[in-house]
Design a protein with these regions (language model features):
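Beta-strand-rich domain onsets/edges
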Residues: 14-23
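Short, ordered, surface-exposed loop/turn motifs in non-cytosolic proteins
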Residues: 22-24, 31-45, 66-68
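A short, solvent-exposed loop/turn motif at the edges and junctions
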Residues: 44-47, 72-84
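Short, acidic Ser/Thr/Gly-rich low-complexity loop/linker segments typical of extracellular
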Residues: 48-59
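Short strand-edge motifs at loop-to-beta-strand transitions and within beta-strands
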Residues: 60-62, 89
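Extracellular beta-sheet/turn segments enriched in Thr/Pro/Gly and aliphatic residues
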Residues: 85-104
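Detector for small/aliphatic-rich hydrophobic stretches
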Residues: 98-228
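Non-catalytic, conformational "gating/processing" segments within enzyme and secreted inhibitor domains
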Residues: 135-136, 145, 178-333, 353-442
Length: 477
């Protein structure tokens, strides 16, 4: 009898603890115009648990231990906001200006398997750039594409899933664990990041996502899920996640679209050593066809990491947040096309690891580029084919549809934009997939020259993981 009473008391105590949890709802908006901040994280201060993520309307719900708790809202480019909880909370983030990040970053340690996945994604970056090269300035985020494919591959099976696994270099379970670890690091759940990544699933209310696919997207990719599948909602989400750099992703949505899956990435950071705007002047730039044109080239002499590979030189210009722009400049007797035809990520990584600090005389163009890149022919060229074929695509784990009704990827594209100036860089990309789915003696530094006065390849790279966030070419046109 005593044991039964003790057990009953324990059950009542546990029930009381569970009941003590309070679910708080609220919205996160920007201070300037009260627009919803989509994809902001809201976490309970002092509690180790995954944060809530705001939806398309900036709304969130989160369990707190009691009404004395505090929550903290964060979104890239905004100062964090901490508030005591209350029902129907309104959290206003100050969007007056992008804060200069601290030099402190979250720590991350990748396992051997995770390093292998990252290597595959970085190698994919170069294969992708080769596939789209048309001797035109371009900008891409291969990481955005890889993350989106990793998320939606949880809804695939058979050959459709296998082809994506081959491209990404891992099985779905490994991809899920990798991005669950990488996204919080890159998007700055701590101080010091000016990079954000967000995922969204806009679902046609006529169909219902399968629970396993839905939960994998939310838990591993922090996906925002909405049944409001329309042009305005999709474009509003894209504009919000890219701070207006990609304001319009879709023009129309087919009524038979089951799902539009999106990944958005945004980067904004200052150079560690800014260029003097007064030093920017028109200088001859040699186009791919040999023609010379006057372009605004920025100039500075400073200490940078510099290396030389087979037929090219490499320069790494650091940002304040732990990332760098890495530029590969073909030798004068070579060309960017020749470099692209043979170079691999392993080649670049070897030169990167052997690079030394030099005093470099830099000439580099101030430029902007905006590209819309259709991805279906590119993916097919890279071996991913069945997802685009209604007769062969297998998305049986994606949603509940009538037996025999095909679900396939009817559209896949990426829009990307980059702005490079004397003070720093802004870059954004949205990928869409629609389913119809060192104090010793002062060191002596070598003097080097890096005059980017001809076409070159560039990357924005995280210095800790080596992850390529953006990659592109500049031809000067």
């Amino acid at each position: 009898m005593r044991h039964q009473l003790l057990l009953l008391w324990l059950l009542l105590f546990i029930s009381g603890v569970a009941d003590a949890q309070v679910t708080i709802c609220g919205r996160v908006v920007a201070s300037s115009d009260s627009t919803p901040v989509i994809g902001a994280t809201v976490k309970v201060v002092g509690v180790e648990k995954s944060p809530a993520v705001t939806n398309i309307d900036g709304q969130f719900s989160i369990d707190v231990p009691d009404m004395q708790a505090e929550v903290e809202a964060a979104f890239v480019g905004f100062p964090k906001k901490r508030m005591k909880v209350q029902q129907d909370m309104l959290i206003v983030l100050d969007d007056g200006s992008v804060v200069v990040p601290l030099r402190k970053r979250l720590r991350i340690e990748l396992t051997e398997g995770e390093d292998s996945i990252l290597h595959a994604v970085n190698e994919f970056s170069f294969r992708l750039l080769r596939a789209v090269n048309k001797q035109k300035t371009t900008v891409l985020s291969p990481l955005s594409i890889a993350c989106l494919l990793g998320m939606t591959n949880n809804g695939a099976a058979g050959q459709t899933q296998d082809e994506v696994c081959q491209l990404l270099g891992c099985q779905p379970e490994a991809a899920n664990a990798f991005y669950k670890k990488l996204i919080p690091y890159l998007t700055g759940d701590g101080e010091g990041s000016c990079f954000s990544m967000a995922n969204a699933l806009f679902v046609n209310p006529k169909w219902k996502l399968k629970e396993d696919f839905r939960s994998q997207a939310v838990e591993n990719y922090r996906a925002c899920i909405s049944n409001d599948l329309n042009v305005k909602s999709v474009n509003d989400w894209c504009a919000s996640q890219t701070r207006g750099m990609i304001p319009q992703m879709v023009d129309e949505i087919d009524p038979n679209t089951l799902l539009t899956a999106l990944n958005a990435v945004y980067f904004e950071s200052q150079w560690s050593d800014v260029f003097d705007a007064g030093g920017t002047r028109p200088i001859d730039f040699t186009l791919a066809n040999g023609t010379k044109v006057k372009l605004p080239l920025m100039h500075q002499k400073h200490l940078f990491s510099y290396g030389e590979g087979d037929g090219y030189s490499m320069l790494a210009m650091p940002y304040t947040d732990g990332c760098s722009m890495v530029v590969l400049l073909p030798d004068e007797d070579s060309s960017l096309d020749r470099l692209l035809s043979s170079i691999s990520y392993d080649d670049v990584d070897k030169v990167w690891k052997k690079s030394t600090t030099c005093r470099v005389d830099v000439l580099f163009p101030r430029f902007e580029a905006e590209v819309e890149q259709p991805l279906i022919p590119v993916m097919q060229q890279l071996g991913v084919r069945s997802m685009f074929d209604a007769r062969r695509a297998d998305y049986s784990r994606l949603a509940y549809v009538e037996r025999g009704v095909p679900v396939y990827v009817s559209e896949m594209k990426q829009k990307a934009r980059i702005e490079v100036s004397e003070t720093g860089t802004k870059a954004a990309a949205v990928t869409e997939q629609s389913f119809l789915v060192g104090a010793a003696r002062p060191p002596q530094y070598r003097n080097c020259t890096f005059h980017a006065t001809r076409p070159f390849l560039y990357m924005i790279k995280d210095n800790i993981t080596g992850s390529i966030l953006f990659i592109g070419t500049y031809y000067g046109e």
